């Protein structure tokens, strides 16, 4: 069964659950079946440790709503981290425990990076040689297998990565074939792939591979979808202001489908025909005022792509 969902931006919550009831009620009223929430927006993990009182506070709110729940791990989580590696492992474990306690079936995780975003502007662009890259990926795979193996009730969904100038490729996950290989290396039935349409659009344009072929490569291990739009123009890591980026069409804009130039029929059309997971319309907070209009467009898009084709 396909479940349509949207996200509550972590910056909107910023550690407070006060807005959750109203946001959840609004999402349910729009006819959506799910919601995705950044765990980091709930202020439930501090220096790797899970605050179970925050979990209970969340559950008390969540129990009032009949929505499918997915969580997004902190963007800063890096299972290849060379600095504070043990803390990153604690964060990953705490995220999975939060999911298990709250009843969330899916945790979206950004795969390990050669250069983490937290080091942009400090570290130089760097990509390991093939041997070092393989060893790092094997270590990450063992880490995920060990920690995720303790939470078989939670699906870990590794997300294909966005691109940044001048650091890309800053992670193997910019390349669909390498992300697929990593999931197969992990070899757990509850570890799969989150296809992010915006990230794929950026990576395909920057690296020169076929967008639809990249999506098709990931399809066999696909467990989760992030659907949003952009113009496929990679920006510099320092370009953070959406008000300035949108006029130039640069970066990971997380716009409603139809505002950019992604060919959704070619990229996700074939996937949606048989997909039975959660498809999240993952938008930036700046689109919240017109959320109803944007979700209607998202619902029409998905319905049209899943409609039977003429014989």
What do these predicted regions represent?
Residues 7-11, 38-42, 74-76, 112-114, ...:
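Active-site beta-loop-alpha junctions enriched in small/polar residues
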Residues 64, 81-192:
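Active-site acidic/histidine proton-transfer and metal-coordination neighborhood
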Residues 1-2, 17, 25-28, 97, ...:
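Histidine-acidic metal/acid-base catalytic patches
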Residues 15, 19-22, 46-54, 83-94, ...:
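Alpha-helix N-cap and loop-to-helix initiation/capping positions
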Residues 35-37, 107, 156, 225, ...:
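Hydrophobic residues within beta-strands of alpha/beta enzymes
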Residues 34, 68, 155-157, 190-194, ...:
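Residues at or immediately flanking beta-strands
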Residues 1-101, 192, 299-311:
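N-terminal pre-domain/capping segments
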């Amino acid at each position: 069964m396909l479940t349509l969902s949207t996200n509550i931006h972590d910056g909107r919550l910023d550690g407070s659950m006060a807005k959750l009831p109203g946001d959840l009620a609004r999402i349910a009223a729009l006819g959506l079946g799910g919601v995705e929430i950044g765990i980091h927006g709930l202020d439930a993990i501090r220096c790797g440790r899970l605050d179970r009182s925050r979990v209970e506070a969340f559950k008390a709110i969540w129990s009032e709503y009949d929505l499918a729940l997915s969580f997004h791990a902190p963007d800063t989580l890096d299972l290849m981290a060379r600095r504070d590696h043990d803390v990153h492992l604690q964060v990953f474990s705490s995220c999975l425990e939060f999911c298990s306690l709250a009843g969330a079936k899916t945790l979206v995780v950004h795969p390990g990076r050669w250069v983490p975003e937290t080091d942009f502007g400090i570290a130089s662009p760097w990509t390991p040689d093939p041997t070092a890259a393989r060893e790092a990926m094997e270590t990450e795979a063992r880490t995920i297998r060990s920690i995720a193996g303790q939470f078989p009730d939670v699906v870990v969904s590794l997300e294909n990565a966005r691109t940044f100038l001048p650091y890309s490729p800053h992670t193997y996950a910019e390349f669909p074939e390498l992300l697929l290989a990593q999931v197969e290396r992990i070899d757990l039935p509850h570890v799969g792939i989150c296809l992010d349409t915006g990230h794929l659009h950026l990576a395909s344009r920057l690296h020169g591979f076929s967008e639809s072929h990249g999506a098709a490569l990931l399809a066999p291990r696909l467990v989760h979808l992030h659907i949003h739009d952009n113009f496929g123009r990679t920006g510099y890591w320092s370009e953070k202001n959406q008000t300035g980026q949108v006029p130039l069409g640069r970066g990971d804009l997380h716009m409603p489908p139809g505002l950019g130039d992604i060919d959704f029929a070619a990229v996700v059309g074939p996937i949606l025909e048989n997909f039975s997971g959660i498809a999240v319309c993952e938008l930036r907070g700046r689109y919240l005022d017109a959320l109803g209009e944007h979700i209607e467009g998202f619902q029409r898009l998905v319905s049209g792509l899943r409609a039977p084709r003429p014989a």
